[in-house]
């Protein structure tokens, strides 16, 4: 597993970020989407 930083915009227009462990960028995005109900868009997923 790798560590990914996911930056996203919430439905209220605020920017936020969170990291998680995942096997791929798409898996990291899915994990963050499951944890945050208020995501409007994913802005960046990068391995850290």
Name what the model sees in each region.
Residues 1-15:
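Short aromatic-glycine-(Arg/Gly/Cys) micro-motifs in beta-strand/loop hairpins
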Residues 24-32:
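Low-complexity, intrinsically disordered Gly/Pro/Thr-rich segments
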Residues 13-23:
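A short, exposed loop/beta-hairpin motif centered on an aromatic-Gly-Thr core
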Residues 34-48:
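Short, mixed-charge low-complexity intrinsically disordered segments
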Residues 13, 32-35:
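Preference for short coil/turn "hinge" residues that link or interrupt alpha-helices
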